[in-house]
Amino acid sequence: MRTAAERKDCPKGRGYPLDLHEKNLSSLHNPKILCIFAATDSATLPIRTANQGGTSFLYTFMNYTKQPLDYHQIIAQLKSRGLLFHNEDVAISQLQIISYFRIANYLKSFEVVGFNHVFLPNSYFEYALDLYYFDKKLRNLLFSAIQSIEVALRSKVIHNVSLRHGAFWFTDIRLATNHAMFQDNLTQIKKEVRRSKEEFIQEHFEKYDSPDVPPVWKTLEVTSFGLLSKLFCNLSDNKVKKQIARELNLPQHLCLESWVKCFVVLRNCIAHHARVWNRRFPQIPQLNVNLRGKWISTTHVRPNKLYAIICCLAYLQDVIHSNNDFKQQIQNLLEQYPNVNLHHMGFPRNWQDEPLWK
């Protein structure tokens, strides 16, 4: 019988684990079963509340037995699954500079739905390679746009909030909505400042020893975009946050907060060279808002897909740099790769007819 401690170790949110007798497990030639789950009203409720006829399933652990393959073996394995190659030598040269596991993320787009490792007819390795390079170029475009928005937001937060609350407002807990988050943010600020190799930070500490952090115009220049986002969102002065939002041509600060959170998530994906083109994002931006600038119809827009975030980036690019070519670069890239499935990125039909994109 599983102990109480073992039951607590079962993954949360998957139902309540039923006990299994050891004799049942030992009867298996290669026992892999961890526990059985039954659908319940809540993962914390006892099994007697399980819905009769509800879903139940096995949660299993298995030993990892796959062995590394050389490049020729990888190609042979892919061919056995139905993948085609225009040039195997070129494929090997690409695998030598891009790991197979990274390319495999793009190969999934050409697999039969519901079947692992079974490729659709007439699927070529080179199609996935094109997707990889498209995604790489797209990440570069998006990263550049996020950078300019990050710098602008950093400047506006430093200027507006410090004029209202002083040079060390980020150390004042009275200006925080969530006090626990305030403590976490301040701890992280001090770590990032102390870790910084910037000359102006080192020169500051050579001259001053109090307070234990530099003023906001120095400190926020060396903190991460994620931390800047947390500071802004946790700021209790909504009046100054609304002022910053309006300077960015947004109607209110909640809209700006939602957009910035999305930018942080996207930036982190890009920084780790992760696939972005067809990703579903955990943060979604507010889209159904009345904006003064050119915007989009949000009726058929999926807010958790990349298109929604690209529109937010494009809107703010027009506010910050009126002569920017971000939208043109996006359109040029899509024309360069006409086989990319725009639906997987969240692009609606006739998206180019939207006021934002004209």
Language-model segments: residues:
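Acidic/aromatic/glycine-rich contiguous surface patches that form carbohydrate-binding/processing clefts
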Residues: 273
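Extended intrinsically disordered or low-complexity regions, especially N/C-terminal cytosolic tails and loops
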Residues: 2, 10, 15-265, 277-358
